[in-house]
């Protein structure tokens, strides 16, 4: 659903372009005539840690329906196009290692029908353990499954998009406690950062561990709702977070695993400033 001008710009820069519907070809044939592209297919199912990150199936806006692949092939053939890659990303935070093996198998079937496909891009979605209750992703089992299915379909190279898995645990959000308040039995600690700095909890009900750095030697035995200063009921970083009972204004707080979909989704809503970004290289801030 990008503006067609962005497709033109991408082709001009030699960028690998992935197309996800046949309407593009019919409405702007001059832009796509003779082009080499990849095709994103909706395999009819999706997965993920939240409904808002499930990117497959009828309710998702992504990808060409598998029922229309032949239609796309006909339109591409009429324009002298070449399809060299197939893509399917069906969600984020998928815990079943066999998921990607299934995607390879399904895409390979379409690739053989098309006849010119060289690469199968099986998307990303590899999860991390955001809390102690989460099982670590079995990367060895994931790799073994891909090796097995690659042996079944040796004609195709595989592409993977492991962004979150690589960077989520590499970043944190640092903030200070501003107020500590009790209301009707609920204890809340406010921070000088809000959902504008890390929107995942508000948007996806996502859990991020939160630690009071100022009182690491104290017992983390009291439930607090950790909130921000923004005028939204969803401006909450976590409910019933275990923190020291004597948590106080001025305490330094860290919200873990903010390296993915953190600053990249930050904004200035409610006139709140963007957080500063510091890069630590061997312990030195840059």
Predicted regions and their residues:
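Active-site-proximal beta-alpha core segment in soluble small-molecule metabolic enzymes
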Residues: 1-119, 128, 134, 145
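Conserved beta-strand positions
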Residues: 19, 88, 122-124, 160-162, ...
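Acidic/histidine-enriched ion/cofactor-binding microenvironments in catalytic or ligand-binding pockets
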Residues: 31, 109-119, 137-144, 148-153, ...
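Flexible glycine/acidic-rich beta-alpha junction loops that bind and position SAM and/or redox cofactors
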Residues: 46-47, 118-134, 159-171, 197-199
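Short glycine/threonine-rich loop-to-helix capping motif typified by GTGT followed
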Residues: 96-103, 130-142, 168-179, 240-243
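Contiguous, function-dense segments enriched for cysteine-driven chemistry
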Residues: 116, 133-149, 153-162, 172, ...
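Charged (often Lys/Glu-rich) extended helix/loop segments that serve as interaction or gating elements
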Residues: 156-286
């Amino acid at each position: 659903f990008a503006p067609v001008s962005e497709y033109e710009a991408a082709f001009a820069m030699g960028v690998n372009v992935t197309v996800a519907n046949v309407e593009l070809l019919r409405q702007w044939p001059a832009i796509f005539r003779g082009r080499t592209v990849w095709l994103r297919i909706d395999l009819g199912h999706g997965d993920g840690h939240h409904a808002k990150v499930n990117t497959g199936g009828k309710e998702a806006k992504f990808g060409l329906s598998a029922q229309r692949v032949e239609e796309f092939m006909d339109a591409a053939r009429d324009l002298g196009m070449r399809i060299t890659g197939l893509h399917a990303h069906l969600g984020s935070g998928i815990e079943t290692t066999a998921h990607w093996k299934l995607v390879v198998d399904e895409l390979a079937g379409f690739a053989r029908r098309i006849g010119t496909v060289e690469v199968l891009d099986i998307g990303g979605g590899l999860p991390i353990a955001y809390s102690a209750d989460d099982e670590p992703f079995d990367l060895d089992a994931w790799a073994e499954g891909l090796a097995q299915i690659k042996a079944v379909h040796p004609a195709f190279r595989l592409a993977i998009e492991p962004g979150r898995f690589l960077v989520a645990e590499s970043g944190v959000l640092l903030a200070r406690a501003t107020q500590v308040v009790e209301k009707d039995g609920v204890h809340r600690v406010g921070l000088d950062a809000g959902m504008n700095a890390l929107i995942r909890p508000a948007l996806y009900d996502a859990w991020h561990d939160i630690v009071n750095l100022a009182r690491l030697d104290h017992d983390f035995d009291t439930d607090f709702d950790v909130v921000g200063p923004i005028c939204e009921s969803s401006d909450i970083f976590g409910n019933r977070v275990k923190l020291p009972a004597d948590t106080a204004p001025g305490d330094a707080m860290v919200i873990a695993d903010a390296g993915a979909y953190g600053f990249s989704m930050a904004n200035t809503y409610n006139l709140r400033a963007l957080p500063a970004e510091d890069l630590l290289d061997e312990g030195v801030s840059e």
